[in-house]
Amino acid sequence: MSRLIIILSVLLSVNSIASESICYGTTSNGRLERGVKLPSSGINFVSYSVSASVLGRTYVHSTVRDIVVASYSRLKAEMPEKVFKYAETGFKKGGEFKPHKTHRNGLSVDFMTPVMNAEGKSVHLPTHVFNKLGYNIEFDRNDRYKGLSIDYDALAAHIVALHKEALEREVDLWRVIFDPGLQPNLFETKHGKYLKEHVQFSKKRSWVRHDEHYHVDFKVPCM
């Protein structure tokens, strides 16, 4: 009986290793093997586009998938009234991912900025073909867009959740790209001290503003 248990354990271990993704190169010049697709929705999150998912634009490294899904579970316990939405990630085999300059080896994920409506309720930022799946949205100087306002508490909590879930898997976040002009608002939340101490944010404005979404690169060992 004990011999059978050992054999089964070995087989399960081999199967687990075989199902893990392998990333190569960098986020800007790499590829991915055995990429996995993020779930289209969960109890407190949704994908930015069903059609984009069908077209294969929501694949990531298996470790990144586990981190992202677990972060939403953590947030459900901490902020049950909040909802979240993820956006572009990459192709199953990585490689060039237009129009993005990165997202090439399964370690890059875009998340749509959490927002609240006029009543202060957490809602999803609208993403459809008429606003380029949300990427064409621009918040004004008051952090508002068509009656919606940026939910900095939810945004900060999500980044913290991603970081903590990454550490539990013995990996990390490499960087978070978010409009530098808006970052002070993140640091004013209750998670501000943690973010300053543990998360590396972009210092300069990127080629796109990154106000309607924040880009996260994960630090996972690659070949």
PLM region spans:
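Catalytic cores and adjacent binding grooves of peptidoglycan-active enzymes
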Residues: 121-223
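Active-site acidic/histidine clusters and adjacent loop/turn architecture
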Residues: 19-86, 151-167, 173
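Extended, low-complexity, intrinsically disordered C-terminal regulatory tails
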Residues: 67-98, 175-201
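Acidic/His-rich structured neighborhood in mature extracellular/periplasmic domains
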Residues: 91-142
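Sec-dependent signal peptide recognition
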Residues: 1-7
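Envelope-exposed proteins and targeting segments
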Residues: 80-82, 105-109, 210-214
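N-terminal signal peptide c-region/cleavage motif recognized by signal peptidases
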Residues: 13-15
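Soluble periplasmic/extracytoplasmic beta-strand elements of cell-envelope proteins
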Residues: 85-87, 108-114, 177, 215-217
